[in-house]
Regions:
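Conserved histidines in hydrophobic membrane contexts and catalytic metal-binding motifs
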Residues: 1-353
Length: 353
């Protein structure tokens, strides 16, 4: 068996079994992506108006006091023109006067929780989570093999074969190859990042930054939001202060005596990865613990910071959510084509004999 025949066997047979899991992941991914798109398109009749530092300080003080369970307060931007307090699975939208405009909870969306965990672990707990991760890694390998196999026969295919003209196996097969080629790169990224999200130990350390004792940061007034935000903004005057986060409180865990807040910035309004620049500050002491821009991270840190955003579009533009949702739709279609052609050529052919 030569290399090409071996890769065809791997792509066909291993791909057939992986397809059964990937169809579940992709169809639920389309649903989750669609929900995210709808959320991001809602403006709640708010017009974007940048807040002053005084308004941001008032918002933080008020919202963290009124909603202690919330872990993040986000300020209006050109992309989301409203104030938002958020924690996992829930967010509250406010107008500029800090009046509640809307409450959004994932649990209120029909079937969201079920489909999310079906996407994450096939509703099978840790076993399903790791099964999903390895299926995603094998899916990434199958994608690379598919690119190689296309390269071997690239001269025999035409752009017009992308859309099948009938339901014959040959037409579906050619469409599978062409469509697969077009989405191969983003599909590979989705598969690989899905694997890495489960195996965080492979990359999480690259995100951790150690405070540099050689850098002396300006001090702020203890327990004074306005003074501390002013200090942080003066450190990066050309950046936009967009969010404040605190560590999420875990049920049953003792509350920390001192909270270090993460003050997050966008380097410019059109930045690809939002909230990527961060200053960590002790609110009680007014002392900056660390300050790190995404552009100052080593290459490993820059790559690691994109692992989750590339998979679920966290802090990424709306256009990226649309892209990966569309990729999931196309991938679902080509996997269905592959199931039909594989069944016809393998099992139906044997039954005729």
């Amino acid at each position: 068996m030569n290399l090409v025949h071996g890769l065809k066997w791997f792509h066909n047979w291993v791909g057939f079994f992986i397809t059964l899991t990937m169809l579940t992941v992709l169809t639920t991914g389309v649903y989750l992506g669609s929900v995210d798109i709808i959320k991001r398109m809602q403006t709640y009749d708010q017009q974007y108006s940048p807040l002053t530092l005084e308004q941001k300080a008032q918002a933080i003080d008020s919202l963290f006091s009124r909603y202690p369970e919330m872990s993040t307060v986000r300020f209006p931007t050109e992309h989301t023109p409203y104030i938002q307090a958020a924690t996992r699975g829930k967010s509250i939208v406010f107008d500029s006067q800090l009046n509640e405009v809307a409450v959004r909870q994932n649990s209120d969306i029909p079937m969201y929780g079920t489909l999310f965990w079906l996407h994450r672990n096939f509703l099978m707990g840790d076993f399903g989570k790791y099964l999903n991760a390895w299926a995603s890694l094998i899916g990434a390998a199958i994608t690379l093999v598919g690119i190689y196999l296309w390269w071997q026969v690239r001269k025999g295919f035409r752009l017009k074969q992308t859309i099948p003209t009938n339901t014959r196996s040959s037409s579906l097969f050619k469409s599978h190859i062409q469509l697969g080629l077009f989405i191969s790169v983003p599909l590979f990224i989705l598969c690989l990042s899905g694997y890495l999200i489960t195996y965080k130990g492979l990359w999480l350390d690259a995100l951790k930054s150690q405070p540099n004792s050689q850098i002396s940061y300006p001090a702020s007034q203890p327990s004074d939001w306005l003074n501390q935000l002013t200090t942080a903004q003066n450190l990066w005057p050309d950046s936009q202060l967009v969010a404040i986060s605190k560590p999420r409180s875990r049920p049953g865990a003792e509350s920390a005596a001192e909270l270090n807040y993460s003050i997050r910035f966008d380097s410019h309004p059109g930045v690809w990865l939002r909230e990527a620049d961060s200053i960590t500050m002790s609110y009680e002491q007014g002392v900056i613990q660390s300050a790190l821009k995404h552009s100052d991270r080593p290459l490993s840190g820059k790559v690691a910071s994109f692992v989750r955003p590339l998979h679920d579009a966290l802090n990424m533009p709306l256009s990226y959510v649309v892209l990966i949702t569309l990729v999931s739709v196309i991938a679902t279609i080509i996997l269905l084509f592959s199931l039909v052609t594989f069944y016809r050529r393998t099992f139906k052919k044997k039954s005729r004999k």
